[in-house]
Amino acid sequence: MALELIGAGFGRTGTLSVCTALNRLGYPCYHMTEVLENRRNRSHLDFWHQVANDPPGTPRDWERVFAGYRASVDNPGCCVWRELLEAYPDARVILTLHPRGAEAWYESTVQTIYAPERMWQFSVLTWLMPRA
């Protein structure tokens, strides 16, 4: 099964709503929640870690994470939407934007996705984490 829809919008732009709608319409959708739900076996985390560290244009086995999906929205797929479009040239691209603009998107992101980093407990834990 090949990707038919590729999301180019970042998280906090309605991607979870789009993903829910696509799933209901029969388009199994890959979203950041898939990465988080698969972290126990690390297969998705390891794949995306490699993508982040490889030079752009490195050949990839996209089916390793997208097997069984017809759509991808949100992170991490939105960060490589151009590569995905090259791999799936018949796919359509969906761009989601925050309805109140870039500044509102930033505030929303800081208050949710990056909120743990601002907590003092997180700062203490980072001291205890091993460094690579």
Segments (PLM) and residue ranges:
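PAPS-dependent sulfotransferase catalytic core
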Residues: M1-D61
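Short active-site oxyanion
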Residues: L3-I6, G68-A71, R92
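Short His-Asn-centered micro-motif
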Residues: G7-G9, T33, V73-G77, L97-H98
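A structural signal for well-ordered alpha-helical segments within the folded catalytic domains
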Residues: R12, L16, C78-R82, E103
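PAPS-dependent sulfotransferase catalytic domain
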Residues: N23, Y27-P28, E34, W81-A132
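Conserved nucleotide-sensing/catalytic segment adjacent to the nucleotide-binding pocket
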Residues: H44-L84
